[in-house]
From Swiss-Prot:
Lineage, highest ranks first: Bacteria, Bacillati, Actinomycetota, Actinomycetes, Micromonosporales
Binding residue positions for Zn(2+): 580, 584, 682, 686
Record-given protein name: Alanine--tRNA ligase
SMART domains given in the database record: tRNA_SAD
Coiled coil spans: none
Cofactor note: Binds 1 zinc ion per subunit.
Domain of life where this protein originates: Bacteria
Any single Gene Ontology cellular-component annotation: cytosol
InterPro entries (UniProt xref): aa-tRNA-synth_II/BPL/LPL, Ala-tRNA-lgiase_IIc, Ala-tRNA-ligase_IIc_anticod-bd, Ala-tRNA-synth_IIc_core, Ala-tRNA-synth_IIc_N, Ala-tRNA_ligase, Ala_tRNA_ligase_euk/bac, Thr/Ala-tRNA-synth_IIc_edit
Pfam families (UniProt xref): tRNA-synt_2c (PF01411), tRNA_SAD (PF07973)
UniProt cross-references to PROSITE patterns, sorted A to Z: AA_TRNA_LIGASE_II_ALA
HAMAP family (UniProt xref): Ala_tRNA_synth_B
Compartmental location: Cytoplasm
Organism annotation: Salinispora arenicola (strain CNS-205)
Length: 892
């Protein structure tokens, strides 16, 4: 059975049993700042399980895209480890419990293929239950599982919690007996290679207290509502139903592996048994390639692009491991163009958007491979040198400083340094590397604390939210309103009041203040309460539904429970709204010219200006940028109506509303339309008509990272003022040149060209002046102990290069058979410098230019025995430097 069919049957089974089919959340864990990626099927439902939000459905089913990388080094070595995987899951939020969850799972697993099930042999399924979970045990008995195949296990195996105080409960796992060829009989407790877990049913029924470790925590009591969270690894089930040994051999992965084997001339499985950990290195590398290429496809498909930070670095590391693995197998050409299309064909039956978006995905993948191959060539050479030097010095490890230099200067990742060093029997001072990295991060983030808004502990916010519910935002339609202060928060948490001079956080019951989000800067303004007034400095939403105003008390006091008047800076809001609407127009226009791969990667909507970051593998030509600007302003002239409305996510997608990569949307979304020109999911504020923007002027386009470009623009009166200043500047230049303004650029180019020619001529004349006396100076050489010595000062204004050239020119005009030393001193910016040139005949007498310079500068300076230089002494010391060299020759 194909993996896509397993997925379809799973969703269909639970949809037929009253479950809402919920799309997978994107791989980036947008809703949790502490996580990079979604790693479990239940993650998008956590707010429902914790009671932070009310679920819009009682029961749900999904197939969640997941990524786990802590064990990335084990990928390919065992049958259990992979980076990307899919988790089938069915969930109940206070609806059904064990008595329905277990039969639902059993029915799908054992129902015949013809009837829509998976057709597993009931005699080969072994359920496990928690030690004292008699309830689950009895349900398993009721569906027909004999007692000797129901295994009771302890807390470490069959009791689930999130690792923190909160929901917890026993779980029941389903294992499938793959047969005696895979190991010992006796059930999951005896051999988990033979008995493969394929489904875990978690029964959330208790609340746990604080504790350490996996088992050391108290059970505080029952939850008000009991929940179900199940997870079936899609790849695990596919390996069972397709009769293959491991997840690398299922239909969504094996074609990639086979193509890699074909390219490298390797025969997969020639050295393997059933246990993947016993495989030959060639097989391990082929599995790494297959796993990582598929993962790269899915990550880029979900909007992640290669970089040196966060999610982008994980993608970069995965891609580079795949590329290096296939090179170690013997393939030295570009691999991604050969493998990525195969991965697309494997995954697009379940994710058709991968085929539609493949042009963009391929652009990033191929560009990253090209960049890495260049890095690999340079970095490997440097690393090989470092390894050789360490061995010569008798060291068994590469220093942390060398590893850091490879990473920081050459972009050579530390994991690759560790891997290559290990292959050559060397270690790396990883602790020293981490220390240097920590120092660098500390410097880069020195001001992070100063910029931080809000409490480290979010519990204060959650308490306010739980007690009063979500804050109502009214700012779409009004700029001021009467509001009640629900809470006053200080650094230590809630407080009764704040007095003049205090900076606190205020929570109102309703507010017209927009909280920073979606690239839009927050509203500023004032809140007047009783006899007090506060200035709003910042507005944030630290937890969903709670708008928090960071404010300074200007006079009087502010108390929780008082009613007052909240008023935003309306002029600032209008300017920000103009910028936000302009960003939508720039986004759509970029896609018009560059294609749908030009997706938004970030934005800033500030008063009078915008910054728009977008994904594209190459820069934007100036001519295209001009066309984009013109088309945006034509949309302004059309005075299009700007309309915002709320609809279902499915309907928004149907009408073509753009959604941002990586964003997690609810069932209901807000759509902003600018006529028929642009349509985008957005929660920000906008103008009523496009004509209200006035003018958009693009200032610049630049790179801010691999595959990410940035456009900056001015909007409205700021754009007009900029153009007015530019006009005055051009008019002034036209006046100076006495030409029409449209000829100014040509005249400036002509002036610059003339200036460059003059500089070249000046340089030529200066060189002639400096070198013109070289022959005469050589003829005036004096004898110092059988050595021809020329000591002279360079003409005023001579450059450092001129001085070196003069010294060598004089040396070249002295008979090579005659030992000669030339010393040329120079004065520049109040300092004296010296260049010494020594010919080969003088070298044979034991004279060294480097030694003579060090004699003149008390050990400082340097160079080769033939040519050396030094500097830094006061200009008046120039004659003395020449005498010192002469004396050094005399004493040699």
């Amino acid at each position: 059975m194909k993996t896509a069919e397993i997925r379809r049957r799973y969703l269909a089974h639970f949809e037929a049993n009253g479950h809402a089919v919920v799309p997978s959340a994107p791989l980036p864990a947008i809703s949790d700042p502490n996580l990079l990626f979604v790693a479990a099927g239940m993650m998008q439902f956590v707010p429902y399980f914790l009671g932070q939000q009310t679920a819009p459905y009682k029961r749900a089913v999904s197939v969640q895209k997941c990524l786990r990388t802590p064990d990335i080094d084990e990928v390919g070595k065992t049958s259990r480890h992979g980076t990307f995987f899919q988790m089938n899951g069915n969930f109940s939020f206070g609806d059904y419990f064990k008595d329905e969850a277990i039969p639902l799972a059993w029915d799908l697993a054992t129902k015949s293929v013809d009837a829509g099930g998976f057709g597993l042999d009931p005699e080969r399924i072994w359920p496990t239950v928690y030690l004292d979970d008699d309830e689950a045990y009895e349900v398993w008995r009721s569906v027909g599982v004999p007692a000797d195949r129901i295994v009771r296990r302890g807390k470490a195996d069959n009791f689930w919690s999130m690792g923190i105080p909160g929901p917890c409960g026993p779980c029941s796992e389903l294992f499938y007996d793959r047969g005696p060829e895979y190991g010992l009989e006796g059930g999951p407790a005896v051999d988990e290679d033979r008995y493969l877990e394929f489904w875990n049913l978690v029964f959330m029924q208790f609340e746990r207290g604080p504790g350490t470790g996996k088992e050391d925590y108290p059970i505080l009591g029952d939850l008000p509502a009991k929940n179900i969270d199940t997870g079936m690894g899609l790849e695990r089930m596919a390996s069972i139903l397709q009769g293959v040994d491991n997840l690398y051999e299922i239909d969504e992965v094996r074609p990639i592996l086979d193509r890699a084997a074909e390219l490298t001339g390797k025969r997969y499985g020639a050295h393997s048994g059933h246990v993947a950990s016993e495989s030959h290195p060639d097989d391990v590398r082929l599995r790494v390639v297959a796993d990582h290429v598929r993962t790269a496809l899915m990550l880029i498909g979900d909007g992640v692009t290669p970089s040196n930070e966060g999610r982008g670095y994980v993608l970069r590391r995965i891609m580079r491991r795949a590329i290096r693995s296939i090179r170690l197998l013997g393939w030295q050409e570009r691999a991604m163009p050969e493998l990525l299309p195969v991965a697309r064909d494997c995954m697009s039956p379940s994710y058709p958007e991968l085929a539609a978006d493949f042009g963009r995905i391929a652009d990033y993948a191929y560009a990253e491979e090209d960049a890495f191959l260049s890095t690999l060539r340079a970095g490997t050479t440097i690393l090989d040198t470092a390894i050789a030097e360490s061995r010569t010095a008798g060291r068994r490890a590469i220093s942390g400083a060398q590893a850091f230099q490879l990473h920081d200067t050459y972009g050579f990742p530390i994991d690759l340094t560790l891997e290559i060093a290990n292959e050559q029997g060397m270690q790396v001072d990883a602790e020293g590397f981490r220390r240097l990295m920590a120092d660098q991060r500390a410097r880069a983030k020195a001001d992070a604390q100063a910029r931080k808004t809000g409490h480290v502990d979010l519990s204060a916010y959650r308490t306010v939210l739980d007690e009063g519910g979500p804050v109502t935002f009214t700012g779409y339609h009004e700029v001021s309103r009467e509001s009640t202060v629900r809470a006053v928060l200080g650094e230590a948490g809630p407080r009764a009041a704040a007095v003049e001079g205090d900076t606190v956080e205020l929570v109102l019951d309703t507010t017209p203040f927009y909280a920073e989000g979606g690239g839009q800067q927050p509203d500023l303004g004032v809140i007047t309460v009783g006899g007090g007034q506060v200035e709003v400095l910042d507005v944030q939403q630290p937890v969903p539904g709670l708008i928090v105003h960071r404010a300074r008390v200007l006079r009087g006091e502010v108390r929780a429970g008082e009613t007052g008047f909240a008023e935003i800076d309306a002029s600032r809001r209008r300017a920000i709204s103009r910028s936000h609407t302009a960003t939508h127009l720039v986004h759509q226009t970029m896609r018009n010219f560059l294609g749908e791969s030009a997706t938004q990667a970030g934005s800033l909507n500030a008063p009078g200006r915008l910054r728009f970051d977008f994904n594209t593998p190459t820069g934007v030509a100036p001519s295209v940028l001009r066309d984009v600007e013109q088309q945006v302003n034509e949309a302004l002239l059309a005075d299009l109506e700007v309309r915002a409305f709320v609809t279902s996510l499915a309907e928004a997608r149907r009408i073509g509303a753009m959604a941002l990569f990586g964003e997690k949307y609810g069932e209901q979304v807000r759509v902003v339309e600018v006529g028929d020109y642009a349509r985008e999911l957005c929660g920000g504020t906008h103008v009523a008509r496009s004509g209200q923007l006035g003018l958009v002027k693009i200032l610049s386009e630049s790179s801010i990272g691999s595959g990410v470009r940035r456009v900056e623009a001015l909007v409205g009166i700021d754009a007009f003022n900029f153009l007015a200043r530019e006009h005055l500047l051009v008019a002034r230049l036209a006046e100076l040149y006495r030409v029409p303004s449209d000829q100014v650029a040509d005249r400036v180019e002509q002036t610059v060209s003339q200036l460059r020619d003059a500089e070249k001529e000046l340089e030529k004349l200066r060189a002639q002046l400096v070198l013109g006396g070289a022959a005469a100076l050589a003829a005036q050489a004096t004898e110092v102990r059988g050595v021809a010595y020329v000591g002279t000062e360079a003409p005023e204004g001579a450059s450092g290069n001129d001085v070196r050239t003069l010294a060598q020119e004089i040396r070249g005009r002295i008979d090579p058979a005659r030992p000669a030393v030339v010393a040329v001193a120079a004065r520049s910016n109040g300092k004296a410098s010296l260049v010494v040139a020594v010919n080969q005949a003088a070298r044979s007498r034991g004279l060294s230019a480097a030694d003579l310079v060090k004699a003149a500068f008390a050990g400082r300076g340097g160079g080769s025995p033939e040519l050396a230089q030094g500097g830094g002494l006061p200009a008046a010391e120039a004659p003395g430097l020449l005498r010192t060299v002469e004396n050094a020759i005399a004493g040699a």
